[in-house]
């Protein structure tokens, strides 16, 4: 509903939606296609993909949409679609993981919708198991996401959580990967470089992992 509201009631500009992972991206992509097809009895041509033609533009017709998923498993060529310029009257909607926080910049992004969640690997040193968990973003990440809006003109950011949640639930910064991911490969790499004590080596990190994790 928010994507549709922005697309129909706000000035032109791409919409960037931050989601935790590929499952949520696909779900939103499918729901947007379905709702846009049905909305105001629009024809399927009102939702377009990268391969659709631009020849069917009509004056006073409902706005059309370019729906673009964006995540790290896409090829470089597929990721380029997020930077494509849509035709006049076409609203680009990029549905992305946190890859769009800092790694890339979508110049024509004017609107950001932030779900406030991220999916990341967490390691339990006691059980020696890893799991992929969905967690709240940090305030620093929320600020980064907010900064993606309005790179070339004033923009808007819609956070899908309350200011109370931001103040009381979100941490200032994300947990460093070295403190939440399994260290097996890293320890082996330290040995392969000729170091004999990975505990001493890792203790010199800016934010060293726990001794139990090592």
Q: What is the predicted function of each stretch?
A:
Residues 1-214:
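P-loop NTPase motor module signature
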């Amino acid at each position: 509903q928010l994507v549709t509201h922005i697309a129909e009631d706000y000035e032109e500009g791409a919409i960037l939606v931050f989601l935790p992972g590929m499952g949520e991206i696909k779900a939103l992509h499918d729901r947007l296609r379905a709702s846009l097809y049905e909305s105001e009895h629009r024809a399927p041509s009102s939702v377009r993909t990268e391969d659709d033609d631009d020849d069917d533009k009509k004056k006073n017709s409902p706005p059309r949409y370019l729906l673009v998923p964006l995540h790290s498993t896409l090829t470089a060529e597929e990721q380029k679609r997020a930077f494509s310029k849509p035709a006049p009257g076409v609203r680009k909607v990029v549905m992305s993981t946190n890859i769009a926080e800092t790694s890339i910049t979508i110049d024509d992004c004017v609107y950001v919708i932030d779900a406030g969640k991220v999916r990341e690997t967490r390691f339990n040193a006691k059980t020696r198991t890893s799991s992929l968990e969905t967690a709240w973003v940090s305030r620093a990440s929320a600020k980064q996401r907010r900064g993606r809006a309005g790179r070339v003109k004033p923009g808007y950011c819609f956070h899908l959580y309350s200011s109370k949640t931001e103040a009381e639930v979100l941490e200032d910064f994300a947990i460093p990967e070295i403190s939440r991911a399994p260290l097996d490969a890293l320890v082996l790499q330290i040995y392969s470089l000729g170091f004999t004590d990975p505990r001493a080596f890792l203790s010199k990190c800016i934010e060293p992992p726990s001794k139990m994790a090592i």
